[in-house]
UniProtKB/Swiss-Prot annotation:
Transmembrane segments: 5-25, 28-48, 49-69, 89-109, 137-157
Domain of life: Bacteria
Keywords for this protein: Cell membrane, Membrane, Transmembrane, Transmembrane helix
Annotated localization: Cell membrane
Name this protein carries in UniProt: Uncharacterized protein YqgC
Any one annotated GO CC term: plasma membrane
Organism whose genome encodes this protein: Bacillus subtilis (strain 168)
Record's bilayer topology term: Multi-pass membrane protein
Pfam family of the protein (one): DUF456
InterPro entries membership: DUF456
Length: 160
């Protein structure tokens, strides 16, 4: 039965990793759900206040990494707040409009459209900013993936 429980916990963690590229899936919620699931299926006794504090810090860093990577990607390539908002909206809408490819194209198209509409930038500049948005998004995915691995690694270190 323990093996089945661990598979269930692993499945919840896998869903969290899917949330790296599909922003409608709240990664942190699924990671914490894995911790709580372990507590219900096995025991909450391994969890100390320090465990929850460390995991909360990881979660805060994860949220910050997402925001900062997008911000730096757009700003580095000359984008404005409008491009950041466009990128975020594109990230949320893109996967639904263009399944799979929308994950990558959404932030790019959103940033480009925002710069073209709000600041009347020329197409070349808007594309450059869109590229910055894409680089920021991909950097954020990598950073968040590493942080999620650290969260799960600390969980495993605590309970095993």
């Amino acid at each position: 039965m323990d093996m089945l429980y661990w598979l269930l916990i692993a499945a919840v963690f896998i869903i969290a990793f899917i949330g790296l590229v599909y922003p409608v899936i709240p990664s942190v919620v699924f990671i914490v759900a894995g911790f709580v699931l372990y507590g219900f299926l096995f025991s909450f006794s391994p969890y100390s206040y320090m465990f929850w504090l460390v995991e909360a810090v990881f979660a805060a860093v994860l949220f910050a990494a997402d925001y900062v990577s997008n911000l730096l990607g757009v700003k580095r390539f000359g984008g404005s707040k409008a491009a950041i908002w466009g990128s975020t909206i594109g990230l949320l809408i893109g996967p639904f409009v263009i399944p799979v490819a929308g994950i990558i194209l959404g932030p790019f198209i959103g940033a480009v459209c925002a710069e073209l509409i709000v600041h009347q930038k020329d197409l070349k500049s808007a594309f450059k900013i869109g590229l910055g948005s894409l680089i920021g998004f991909l950097t954020g995915v990598i950073a968040k993936g590493i942080i999620q691995l650290l969260m799960i690694g600390y969980f495993l270190w605590t309970v095993l």
